[in-house]
Amino acid sequence: MIEGEWAGQVTGLGDQQVEIAMMRTPDGHNRLELSRFLRPGIIADHRNAPVNALGYLRAMFTVDDIHETLERLGKHGVELVGDVVDYRDVYRLCYVRGPEGLLIGLAQELS
């Protein structure tokens, strides 16, 4: 269960509660996150949908430098959804929304 102020800052949802299952691909090089948002309620319009909207509306990528990536993507119309937040000195995380409304998560490994 993921909840708390830091999580709401990353997603821009404020008070949230989400169950997450993290799976590793058989080759060990990638991971797939499955999320079920319990709080807040769900909104259906994907163009302005929050991070917890139903359906496949987001993907997450590992980046070497999250701030450099944000600067580069910002030049192409990508906007930060919530805040850039550190999770337990393990990851620096954020979500961005591209010009077509697709949500992209960015994760920088800190260790």
Model-derived features: positions:
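N-terminal beta-strand motif that seeds the catalytic metal site of vicinal oxygen chelate
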Residues: 1, 55-61, 107-111
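Conserved catalytic-core motifs of GNAT/GCN5-like acyltransferases
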Residues: 1-5, 82-85, 108
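Core segments of cupin and vicinal oxygen chelate
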Residues: 1-29, 75, 94
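Feature marks short, surface-exposed loop/turn motifs that line or immediately flank catalytic pockets
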Residues: 4, 38-41, 110
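Short, structured secondary-structure boundary patches
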Residues: 14-20, 99-106
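Vicinal oxygen chelate
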Residues: 26-31, 36-103
